């Protein structure tokens, strides 16, 4: 099956690109099949060979050594060495006799001429035999060796000629010997100078990569045109001719580079003059063709093109044009410079392979930029030269901030008008206005959203802004006596709740309004759903009203500690009508802070209301309040999915009850063990501890399918500060053991994950996420650990019952989220339910987390700037340059240390949200 897949991949690649090096591609495919067929081999290593195959399919030049592959993507030192060893024993299928360069034909031509000169000397039979042997070996030798051998052959032939002339004569005198030496030296100098001139001119040879259409500029004032109706001349090539070019003739034949001198088809009688000078440096490589040209342009071509126009015919209509591959023309910039003689592509300077053409007509105008075509190559680190007609890249357009995008941000005028029509449901009684797109609405449950600035470990980057900004625009609250400039963000039109927020300075300025009315208030909040007084005061749908009547799930959204929404240094503002049904004490006046809700005189639960009425007892001398509550029991709640086996589903609960622990089995949306404290009125108070139990095999499977990462994230955002990850099974002992066979056997049982991989995951969880890792050997050890924790809670929370209650802050740290607010088990399940109604920003954040390399902190940073997928799409769509778009998120920061995203994640996000298939 693997061979068939490789064959299909190769055929698909060959359909798009004709591979010039099929033997190397075949060799790499064999390497891939060998790796796949090898037992225990790492299949990921085949990606290197596949990348090399893609580069070879795009590379337009033949490869004759492994060193030439160094410039290609996917070829490292080891792979280059393998290919080099392979090419030593395998010839190129298209060029079996070596590289097809023009220099080879020139060297063969010179060697053949030397053979002809040596054959004329009848007395040098031995030298002729040596020369023939050398010429036969020159096909496999390098060009430098050919030059040296030809030079040695010429010197030996001259010496033998001089010696043969002296045979039969008397012994030469000293003067004659000196004369012979001088002649030999002069001949050597002439030969060396001729060879140097030949090499210098050969280095200037241009060998263009063949393309579909080749156009040449001959330096004329007006270029040749293919239109017969035009008065200008035309020139056409026999290669890749089109139907329009069938009536034009341009005959030439480069011949085979392996057969010596190329053959030229000259149709004119004057071509014989060229054949006499076949050994010259320029005329030997010229190609003669006949073109039609207008009389008005004859003189112009004769003056400007001395190297091309050979002579005029008698009729004056035809001109013989000689084309040479040697660089003897003036206007050679339009041709693409090819590799010089026998140089590896790794040593070549990068060049731009840009061909400019306009359909079938060649255009020489500088304004014709739309017809430029850029041919990409698989070379590494391409540096393109600058041409007048090069591709013009549009400047990078930085994405505007969300506050500047008119598509989804609208600002009110500065004329102190009220908020205009906003599509907010009138059924919701709590209404608010946002000061900026960066302030999010609190959520309806007792804990804010995981993606709100208050719940992330990273403190909000906008904290200092609210502290220092005392301008009227920072205020969002609206009193009846004063108005402020409000900003409406249409991205949050679907938010369920809104808050009236006022800066800390404005609260101090408005303290006098509260002193005249709030002297006898007692600071208690009534959350009963049947409070008629509050409901009667909120019949008006005015935007300034603040309704405190809400369900138990929505109560006390803004009463948070340093990690909550109040951390943004803003305070809630109420009007007299809003506070008509509640008691307000003196803490607002003295401290200008929202008091903490503290349970006091809690009535027993009734059928009509499951929530409790809480109040605070404060005094002028004490800013901090103490809790007066008595707990009578601690209950351990076990998830109904935590069982020992199918037959013993209640094993854990029964064992805990036998040990004197009040344990119950209930459904938990998150976690496996939680604790609830029962007060004297039988009200439940969720404690600030949660345990997630994992067997070793379950941990391995959760890491593979991704549940491990998701559960850690949900646990960190559950509201519980003390998260315990309990691993049931032997992990540490297996890791520390020296037996490799034991590790291998252990890993096969646990989804092929080694103990080292599991240990790495646990250490990362403990250090990065701050989660407590606890290991137990068996389920009985797990039960012992649960018993010890429960006894600890009893000691801390029930020890002061006989002394009349108390505890203060010592009790608060054991309550859910370190708050003095009651949270029941039902509220906890609603808060952490997977199927709860997510807001758009939460749904968008969970979508971003699924992207490889995008963590929760990175998703939070993105949603701070782009709160909706549409805002992100519009911002990326405004970036026209792909390179700048792929690096758009590169400089985004995340985490406490303000680390950068990097290029890889930025490219993935850009390509995902700009992909047409994804948008459809």
From Swiss-Prot:
Record region (Disordered): 90-190, 265-297, 335-376, 457-490, 505-560, 595-621
Recorded superkingdom: Eukaryota
Transport in keyword set: no
EC number per UniProt: 3.1.22.-
Biased composition (Polar residues): 166-178
Protein's cellular compartments: Nucleus
Domain ERCC4 positions: 635-731
Disulfide bonds: none
Extent of Acidic residues compositional bias: 540-556
UniProt GO molecular function: 3'-flap endonuclease activity; crossover junction DNA endonuclease activity; DNA binding; metal ion binding
Record's compositionally biased regions (Low complexity): 108-142, 152-165, 265-282, 351-372, 471-490, 505-539, 607-620
The keyword NAD appears for this protein: no
Gene3D superfamilies: 3.40.50.10130, Crossover junction endonuclease EME1, DNA-binding domain, DNA polymerase beta, N-terminal domain-like
Needed cofactors: Mg(2+)
A UniProt-annotated Pfam family: ERCC4
Record-level GO BP terms: DNA catabolic process; double-strand break repair via break-induced replication; mitotic intra-S DNA damage checkpoint signaling; resolution of meiotic recombination intermediates
SMART domains tied to this protein: ERCC4
Subunit structure: Interacts with eme1.
Cited function: Component of a DNA structure-specific endonuclease with substrate preference for branched DNA structures with a 5'-end at the branch nick. May be required in mitosis for the processing of stalled or collapsed replication fork intermediates. May be required in meiosis for the repair of meiosis-specific double strand breaks subsequent to single-end invasion (SEI).
Protein name: Probable crossover junction endonuclease mus81
């Amino acid at each position: 099956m693997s061979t068939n897949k490789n064959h299909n991949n190769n055929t698909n690649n060959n359909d798009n690109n004709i591979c010039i090096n099929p033997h190397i591609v075949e060799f790499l495919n064999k390497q891939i099949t060998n790796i796949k067929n090898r037992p225990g081999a790492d299949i990921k290593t085949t990606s290197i060979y596949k990348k090399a195959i893609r580069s070879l399919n795009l590379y337009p030049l033949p490869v004759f050594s492994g060193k030439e592959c160094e410039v290609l993507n996917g070829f490292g030192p080891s792979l280059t060495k393998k290919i080099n060893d392979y090419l030593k024993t395998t010839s190129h299928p298209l060029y079996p006799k070596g590289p097809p360069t023009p220099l080879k034909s020139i060297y063969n031509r010179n060697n053949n001429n030397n053979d002809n000169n040596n054959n004329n000397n009848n007395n040098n039979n031995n030298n002729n035999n040596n020369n023939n042997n050398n010429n036969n070996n020159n096909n496999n030798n390098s060009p430098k060796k050919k030059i040296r051998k030809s030079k040695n052959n010429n010197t030996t032939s001259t010496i033998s000629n001089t010696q043969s002339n002296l045979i039969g004569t008397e012994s030469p005198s000293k003067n004659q010997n000196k004369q012979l030496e001088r002649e030999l030296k002069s001949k050597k100098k002439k030969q060396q100078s001729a060879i140097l001139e030949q090499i210098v001119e050969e280095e200037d040879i241009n060998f263009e990569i063949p393309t579909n259409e080749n156009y040449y500029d001959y330096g004329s004032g007006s270029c040749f045109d293919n239109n017969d109706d035009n008065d200008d001349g035309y020139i056409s090539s026999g290669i890749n001719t089109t139907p329009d070019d069938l009536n034009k003739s341009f005959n030439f034949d480069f011949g085979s580079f392996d057969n010596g001198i190329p053959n030229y088809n000259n149709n004119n009688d004057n071509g014989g003059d060229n054949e006499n000078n076949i050994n010259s440096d320029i005329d030997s490589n010229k190609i003669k063709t006949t073109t039609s040209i207008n009389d008005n342009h004859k003189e112009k071509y004769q003056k400007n093109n001395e190297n091309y126009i050979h002579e005029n015919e008698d009729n004056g209509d035809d001109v013989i044009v000689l084309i040479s591959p040697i660089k003897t023309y003036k206007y050679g910039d339009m041709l693409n410079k090819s590799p010089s003689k026998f140089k590896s592509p790794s040593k070549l300077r990068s060049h731009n392979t840009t061909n400019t053409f306009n359909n079938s007509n060649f255009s020489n105008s500088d304004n014709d930029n739309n017809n430029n075509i850029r041919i990409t190559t698989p070379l590494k680190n391409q540096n393109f030269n600058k041409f007048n007609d090069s591709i013009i890249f549009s400047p990078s357009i930085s994405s505007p901030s969300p506050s500047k995008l008119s598509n989804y941000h609208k600002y009110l005028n500065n004329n102190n008008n009220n908020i205009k029509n906003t599509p907010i449901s009138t059924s919701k009684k709590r209404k608010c206005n946002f000061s900026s797109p960066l302030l999010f609405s609190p959520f309806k449950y007792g804990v804010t959203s995981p993606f709100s600035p208050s719940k992330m470990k990273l403190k909000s980057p906008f904290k200092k802004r609210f502290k220092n900004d005392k301008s009227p625009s920072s205020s969002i609250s609206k009193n009846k006596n004063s108005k402020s400039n409000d900003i409406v963000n249409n991205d949050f039109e679907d938010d369920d709740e809104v808050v009236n927020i006022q800066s800390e300075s404005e609260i101090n300025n408005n303290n006098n309004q509260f002193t005249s009315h709030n002297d006898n208030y007692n600071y208690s909040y009534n959350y009963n759903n049947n409070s008629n007084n509050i409901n009667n005061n909120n019949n008006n749908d005015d935007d300034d009203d603040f309704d405190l009547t809400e369900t138990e799930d929505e109560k006390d959204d803004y009463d948070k500690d340093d990690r909550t929404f109040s951390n943004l240094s803003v305070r809630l503002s109420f009007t007299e009508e809003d506070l008509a049904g509640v008691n307000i004490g003196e803490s607002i006046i003295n401290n200008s802070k929202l008091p903490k809700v503290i349970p006091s005189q809690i009535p027993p639960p009734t059928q009509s209301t499951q929530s409790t009425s809480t109040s605070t007892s404060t005094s002028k001398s004490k800013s901090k309040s103490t809790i007066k509550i008595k707990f009578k029991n601690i209950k351990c709640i076990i998830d109904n999915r935590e069982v020992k086996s199918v037959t013993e589903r209640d094993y854990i609960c029964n064992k805990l009850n036998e040990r004197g622990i009040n344990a119950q089995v209930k459904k938990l949306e998150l976690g496996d063990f939680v604790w609830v404290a029962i007060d004297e009125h039988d009200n439940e108070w969720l404690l600030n501890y949660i345990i997630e139990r994992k067997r070793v095999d379950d941990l391995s499977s959760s890491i593979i399918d991704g549940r491990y990462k998701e559960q850690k994230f949900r646990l960190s955002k559950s509201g519980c500060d003390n998260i315990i990850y309990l691993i049931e099974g032997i992990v540490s002992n297996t890791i520390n053991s020296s037996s490799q066979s034991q590790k291998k056997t252990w890993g096969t049982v646990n989804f092929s994950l080694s103990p080292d991989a599991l240990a790495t995951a646990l250490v990362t969880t403990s250090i990065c996420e701050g989660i407590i890792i606890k290991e137990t050997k068996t389920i009985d050890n797990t039960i012992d650990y649960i018993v010890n924790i429960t006894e600890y809670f009893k000691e801390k929370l029930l020890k002061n019952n006989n002394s009349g209650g108390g505890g203060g802050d010592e009790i608060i740290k054991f309550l859910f989220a370190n708050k003095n607010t009651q949270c029941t088990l039902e509220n906890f399940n609603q808060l952490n339910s997977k199927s709860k109604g997510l807001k758009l920003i939460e749904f968008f954040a969970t979508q971003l987390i699924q992207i490889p390399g995008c963590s929760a902190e990175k998703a939070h940073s993105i949603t701070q700037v782009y709160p909706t997928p549409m805002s992100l799409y519009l911002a990326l769509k405004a970036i026209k340059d792909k390179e700048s778009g792929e690096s758009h998120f590169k400089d985004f920061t995340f985490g406490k240390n303000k680390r950068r995203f990097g290029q890889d994640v930025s490219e993935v996000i850009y390509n995902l949200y700009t992909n047409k298939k994804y948008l459809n």
